[in-house]
Amino acid sequence: SVMDAAFAAKRAALTVDLLVQNLSPHSNRGSEGAVPTKLYTNTEGIRGSERIPCGADGYLKEEAVEEAKRCIQCHCDECMKSCVYLSEYKKYPGLLAREIYNNTQIIMGDHQMNKPMNSCSLCGQCTVTCPNGFDMSQVCKSARENMVSTDKMPLAPHEFALMDMLFSNSDAFLCKPQPGYETCRYVFFPGCQAGAIAPDVVMDAYEDLCARVEGGVGLILGCCGAISEWAGRYEMTEKVNEQLKQELAKLGDPVIIAGCPSCMKQLKENTGAEVRGIWEILKEIGLPGKARGLEMPVAIHDACGARGDTRTQDTIRELLTAMGCTVEDTEYSRDLSPCCGYGGLTAYANKEMAAKMTEKCLERSDAPYITYCMACRDRFAREGRESRHILELLYGDNACNMPDISEKRYNRLVLKEKLLKNIWNEELMMEKKDYTVAYTEDAIRMMDERMILKSDVEHVLADYRESQEAVFDEETK
């Protein structure tokens, strides 16, 4: 064949080169002929073709062109096919990893790879799709930690998310045993996004667990620390871990019932406690009385936090089937499921990239989406797609309109207030204002896009009312 001829010519050329140098023609030849390769090439959908016969004098020009066309240009882009992050930057992981590493070594000057390293959702999909298991998420996560520890990473890309985590673990934080118990066998940890987006679901779920689970079920409202870990802020994560360990000790170190797969993963790795998903508990004790499935086929979006967790993936599908849902698995589901755009704080560091990630998720099916991560449900609903968190189906509640960033904080406080009042007969005195602020729809939309809280605006106005000092903009009067 022509390849054999080309190999023979190269082999002969190497022999001549060695002889000219007065070296043995048998030395320093390296690997010759066919050798194993680590390069993976997906040949699915590629049809074989007949080799063009080669005459004794070689190919004619036209024959050579036709034979060359049979080459499929072997390359591996399995991770780039499904990962928006890699496909948008149009760089293979090896090259991107090198550039990110070089970025961490810059002492003075522009760190131009900060945005790319902060745009990865840290979901781990690339590791599953890569035939060699290359983990781009670990590269980006380690780089963030390195940049933070050496004071090279600006706070700006993740500041709002980190402040929101601190709010969840301070003003909106709550840790209580079930009434009638000093310590509990279990504690429900719904996660900060559930309380912000669907507070009624959290309340109904907790009341149901208290009524049907033996041994007492405590409650912790707060953040698991995934936010600071994604941001590479190791010290903040350690403070969250210590806070949660202390609160769990007060409850008698109970088994944690997590309402979020990311929380479940984070708490398992950092608290030393036994952690189970609420879906596992409900499978054991039976569906709540208000559980209702959708009458139409539904598409499941598997959460990043459940990647590699076959038990959780199966349990979710079993619960949906038990509710009468017709479950549809999409092309990229289970361990291959893409990130919704919230993971890794992509939604804060690179909104355009996050929007494309959400779009990538939604293009897999036209059916309503069922999630078991509240952040996924929030992002899909914001794009106008009908979606439900599985707990909304299980407890007959629907978050309806997706709250903006200010409403999410307010929802957490209201949830805490209602739980204290209805479950523990305690009053929480929320701050009362003697005035109201009217916002136009455009203002609310712009504030949400720019991550400006209503409370920030009200603090500015309160300061003005006290000091009577302000800057007047002639153009917007």
Regions found by a protein language model. Name each.
Residues 1-34, 63, 112-148, 240, ...:
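Extended, hydrophobic interaction surfaces within ordered domains
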Residues 1-119:
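Ferredoxin-type iron-sulfur electron-transfer modules and their immediate structural context
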Residues 38-55, 81-100, 128-146, 230-235, ...:
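Iron-sulfur (Fe-S) cluster-binding segments and ferredoxin-like electron-carrier domains
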Residues 78-86, 155-159, 474:
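Short coil/turn segments at secondary-structure boundaries
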Residues 90-259, 264-273, 411-421:
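Iron-sulfur-cluster electron-transfer modules
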Residues 187-188, 299, 370:
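Conserved beta-strand elements of the Class I
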Residues 193-279, 305-321, 328-418:
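Cofactor-cradling patches in redox/metallo enzymes
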Residues 400, 404-477:
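Ribonuclease/tRNase effector modules and their secretory precursors
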